Amino acid sequence: MERQRSFSVKSTRVLAFIITIISSAIVFFTFFSSSLLKSNSSLYPTPEANFQIDLSPIAAISDSSVSPQASPILISTHFNSPENTSGSSKISVFEQKISGESLVKEVREIANLTSIKVIELPSNNGEDKKTEKRIEECDVTKGKWVYDSDYPLYTNASCPFIDEGFGCQSNGRLDLNYMNWRWEPQDCHAPRFNATKMLEMIRGKRLVFVGDSINRNQWESMLCLLFQAVKDPKRVYETHNRRITKEKGNYSFRFVDYKCTVEFYVTHFLVREGRARIGKKRRETLRIDAMDRTSSRWKGANILVFNTAHWWSHYKTKSGVNYYQEGDLIHPKLDVSTAFKKALQTWSSWVDKNVDPKKTRVFFRSAAPSHFSGGEWNSGGHCREANMPLNQTFKPSYSSKKSIVEDVLKQMRTPVTLLNVSGLSQYRIDAHPSIYGTKPENRRSRAVQDCSHWCLPGVPDTWNHFLYLHLLHKR
């Protein structure tokens, strides 16, 4: 009896002990789970609490009006027609994707612009996809014009070198949005033009522009860009005390503090214009086998920027009748493309003979387009109505000449960099002087419109930006 009683007491105690352990485990597990959930919520906060996107620059865009000040419009970016035209500008759905390289937020509805789908934010190390491609490996000619309120880099008031023909604002142009467009390459982030760095790169050197009035357009742009970094304006002067006009063609501006000169020499064709006797009369001819008479002044330059194209579309050069001369021979008739190639071969021979590639960088700028509508420059052609860039390229005018230039450059011993500005300039019908190439008091009611040159500040600033990038990354 005594053994059985002792055994039943022990069984009861064991059972009670087991129940106590189970109860304690349940309580502990409940407490631990609650703590774990709280901990996880602190480790992974909601996207709204940690990530913010500033949508203020993104505004609804309709077909009826576009305000560059309101939104950074990307020219040649096309938007699908909105399914909902209520005008709401809120974000309806976010999808968050997190990876080791980047954070991508997909916005499915922003201001009813249903084609804007992805916004890419920088990765954790501060580099994005565009910067992965080195600028020297990037084709900066592929891109689009974007409206940038930080532009222009100078104004008609801050630059004293803009002649009347290019000073559109000074001549009364009121729509000034043409100044605010910046070219943005699609595959890389190009550093902005830095006037101080550019001056340091040409310290003690000669930067020489050679060509027609379109190259003078670019040269004046370069003077204006560089002048913004000069502390004392009196330390910049023209070495022959010449004032920039359309009449006088040769200039040399010295930047005293940098011991450099920025020069321009006018030549419409790079080869020699002259006169020869044809029958009983002396007529204008073009010596396609001889260099321009100013070529001796180009020697010794450290950076040479050439161009020719615009005057090759003139009626004299296009007709080619008793105009092109080689030696004593005046061609009764010569095709303009053949003459253009012969002239470039004369130029290329001069470069190969007179330029030392170890001391001089040579550039050739491609043709810049004209945008005449309704006629040519002397037959009622106009571009006054344009106040925005085109959303598609204008019909190319110099495609055949571009291929000739490329072929000639390939045959040269001296390395020559082609500054290809034709494509990006095609969009900018809005950036020509039009009727604003003269002062209002000198303007006739039926004045010829200038749809070939460019307002300053304007498109030539981008050409010089390309030149800057080549010098910066290929030193």
UniProtKB/Swiss-Prot annotation:
Q: Which family does it belong to?
A: Belongs to the PC-esterase family. TBL subfamily.
Q: What else is known?
A: Contains 2 motifs that are conserved in esterases, but it is unlikely that this protein belongs to the catalytically active pectin esterases.
Which compartments does it reside in?
A: Membrane
- Free-text function comment from the UniProt entry: May act as a bridging protein that binds pectin and other cell wall polysaccharides. Probably involved in maintaining esterification of pectins. May be involved in the specific O-acetylation of cell wall polymers.
Any single GO molecular-function term of the entry would be: O-acetyltransferase activity
Q: What is this protein called?
A: Protein trichome birefringence-like 6
Which parts of the sequence form the motif DCXHWCLPGXXDXWN motif? Answer: 450-464
GO CC terms for this protein?
A: membrane
Membrane association type = Single-pass type II membrane protein
Q: Which PANTHER family match?
A: PROTEIN TRICHOME BIREFRINGENCE-LIKE 6 (PTHR32285:SF19), PROTEIN TRICHOME BIREFRINGENCE-LIKE 9-RELATED (PTHR32285)
In the UniProt record, does the keyword Isomerase occur? no
Q: Where exactly are the transmembrane stretches of this chain?
A: 14-34
Q: Which UniProt keywords apply?
A: Membrane, Signal-anchor, Transmembrane, Transmembrane helix
Please name the gene that encodes this protein: TBL6
